[in-house]
């Protein structure tokens, strides 16, 4: 059984309840410990001080595979819409770079990576939050984006390949993550 890490999602993107407020991806300081918590897989780690993590004050996973690493899902804004809402003046180039950065964190974190359908081609839902009652024009995946955003698609594919090829990104046991193999730079 695994749990979605809202700590990582909101540490990167901003609080789900305030779509206009950014966080780490927007260059706003204060959520670095939540990002570290997610990278470590929601387990106890000597460089994670849970008193500074959003939503939790102690590790809630015993093993990193009990945490799902993600930045968006069907509830709430998709990643592209979230970045646009929290950074209204974002350029298309910045959007692509931050999208790639967000997924780099997801795929190089301990835990189980999760991507929302269409994120690999920069899907948007026209800024509609929680679109379960919206029409297909909002919810359908526009596969033409695979052509226009082919470089992003290839980037995601390479992240998946990297994760599969290197066991450091998928350690199932907490001990090597906490005490041997995972160290964060002190400025993060």
Language-model features, listed with the residues they occupy:
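Conserved alpha/beta catalytic core and glycan-binding cleft of carbohydrate-active enzymes
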Residues: 1-117, 121-122, 132, 167
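Extended hydrophobic/aromatic segments used for targeting, binding, or gating
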Residues: 125-149, 153
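Short, glycine/acidic-rich hinge or "gate" loops at secondary-structure transitions
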Residues: 118, 172-173
